[in-house]
Each structure stands twice: as C-alpha cells, then as structure tokens.
C-alpha cells in the first residue's frame, strides 16, 4: 500500500482529524489519527494489516514467532497481524503504571517477538513495551506499525517497519503556533486510561 492509499483508508473511516490535539506523548498537534475509527471496521483493518504483514515478511521472512502489542491501541492491529502471519498474538498492559504480561500470557527465551503498534509518534509506548518483553528473556527482533508519525525519527530501540510514514508536526504545550493556540485542546488518546 502506498502512503496515499493508507491515508485514504483513514480518511474514509473518518479517522484523519484536524484540530488541536494532546497526543499520548503530551505533545500537541493539529492532526490526529483516530485509529479506533479504522479498527471499528474489520475489513479496513484487515486490508491495512495484510499489507503490513506482507511488508514485515519481505523484511524479516519467517523470523517472528509471536506478536506482542501494547494495550490498548495495539490490541486490534496486533490481533489482526497475528492472524495474517499465523502467529500467536499477546499484549502487555499497564499495571502500576508499567507494561507487563498478564492474563496468563507468557514468553520464553526462545521467542522472537514482533511488537505491533498502531501509530508511532515518539516511540515512548514502544520502548516501554519492549522493556517489558525484554524482562521475560524473549528477544524483540523488530516493531511494526501502521503509521509512523515521526517520519522515521522515532527511536524504538529495534528496527521499525511502518506501513507508511506520515510526518505531522508536534509541539510542546509552551511552543504552540498561533493557529493551535487559538483552538481548545482535546485529548483523544489512550495513555493514562485505567
């Protein structure tokens, strides 16, 4: 899928929003990708994840043995990527503010993990997810995401395979451009949810 095709899927789902948004990282942006709207449509989600799975296979072959995603945003694409790749799909979730495997999920030292995220902006959630996986003894070999908002600048600590890059400016709250200062901010992301 091309960048335009990926963004067309987001637009068609009403998921490419404009306004003043507080991102999960705390940065502010005039554009927000509301992936929940994309993921509410199974066929659209399947198309995007099928294309991402093909890209992952082209770069990694059959190296991954398990998919792990961070809750909450990564659960749906993680599940669909696991389905597309014929792998088990697990997720980490926050407990006392830190990602951990729960619900009886386990990894072994032999597991070669592909982390699957929805959108990568700064890479913070990715790094936290990878840290939790590393504590299990498993090896994270790469991360895959639908959209890399950083334009390739985010450092997640492992190779990042993005279906597309979509560089969107993001600003600290005290360095907003005038057009964002004039609009009330909303926080549509999931960081901080219980």
Swiss-Prot record:
Keywords: Glycosyltransferase, Magnesium, Pyrimidine biosynthesis, Transferase. GO terms for biological process: 'de novo' UMP biosynthetic process; pyrimidine nucleobase biosynthetic process. Pfam families: Pribosyltran. GO terms for molecular function: magnesium ion binding; orotate phosphoribosyltransferase activity. The keyword Transferase applies. Orotate binds at residues 121, 149. Its cofactor is Mg(2+). Coiled coil: none annotated. SUPFAM superfamilies: PRTase-like. Pathway: Pyrimidine metabolism; UMP biosynthesis via de novo pathway; UMP from orotate: step 1/2. Homodimer. HAMAP family: PyrE. Belongs to the purine/pyrimidine phosphoribosyltransferase family. PyrE subfamily. This is Orotate phosphoribosyltransferase.
């Amino acid at each position: 899928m091309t960048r335009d095709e990926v963004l067309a899927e987001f637009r068609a789902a009403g998921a490419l929003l404009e306004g003043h948004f507080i991102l999960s990282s705390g940065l502010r942006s005039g554009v927000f990708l509301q992936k929940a709207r994309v993921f509410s449509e199974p066929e659209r989600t399947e198309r995007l994840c099928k294309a991402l799975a093909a890209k992952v296979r082209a770069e990694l072959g059959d190296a991954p043995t398990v998919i792990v995603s961070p809750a909450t945003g990564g659960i749906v694409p993680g599940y669909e990527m696991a389905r597309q790749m014929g792998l088990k799909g697990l997720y980490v979730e926050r407990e006392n503010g830190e990602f951990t495997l729960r619900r009886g999920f386990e990894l072994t030292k032999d597991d070669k993990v592909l982390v699957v995220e929805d959108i990568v902006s700064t890479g913070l959630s990715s790094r936290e997810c990878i840290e939790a996986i590393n504590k299990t003894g498993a090896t994270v070999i790469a991360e895959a995401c639908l959209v890399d908002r950083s334009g390739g600048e985010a450092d997640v600590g492992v190779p990042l395979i993005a279906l597309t890059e979509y560089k969107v400016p993001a600003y600290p709250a005290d360095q907003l451009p005038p057009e964002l200062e004039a609009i009330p901010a909303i926080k549509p992301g999931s960081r901080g949810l219980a």
